[in-house]
Amino acid sequence: FQKMGNQCGFLFYTQAWNTSKIDPVTGFVNLFDTRYETREKSKTFFGKFDAIRYNVEKDWFEFAFDYSNFTSKAEGSRTNWTLCTYGERIETFRDEKQNSNWVTRKINLTDKFKELFAKYNIDIQADLKEAIAQQDSAEFFKGLLHLLKLTLQMRNSETGTNVDYMQSPVADAKGNFYNSDTCNESLPQNADANGAYNIARKGLVIIDKIKRSDDLKKIDLKISNKEWLQFAQEKPYLNE
């Protein structure tokens, strides 16, 4: 022990999959592909949502869905969610007025959705899922997919500043939306901290595997994506 220096221990490698861009409260991750391809594919995509509606009381739009209708990546974890256009996002785009350099701007999601629907004469009080299915404009679907992408964008960073925060699009059991700028001290206070927080939580999974193993020589410390989502969503460590 005299030759070991001041510190000794073990390092474990763990996969970084969905550790920085995950809601640390609900365990929600974005598994959608929001790239525009064709109008018909866009109609099919939005047709898979259970409901698309405007919540008058809350003044936001809601996209209710079951991941099972879109992808198999959520298999074995929670699949039913409701996305809400709550809060602001930082949009990154090329500005022609600045030699097409990348710039950022903060946008209010709900206002942008209202503008898009108004442009195409869509009544937000009506059945939005049906109204979307009736659209034939490629530009409309490009705009809608872009806004959905921004809704799903949890990490928001502003070029040339220290602004770098997390904003979840789904509410927790109490109706609150995780935001790293306003959350309590027990949760990550910025986007980088969220990555470290969730890597540490994967460490808890590894420790649990070691504790439960009957043969440490044959233990498998690999964490599957399914295992990680289940752990992040169920948070079993809170009951210990």
Question: What is each PLM-predicted segment?
Answer:
Residues F1-E240:
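Positively charged, helix-rich recognition surfaces that bind polyanionic ligands
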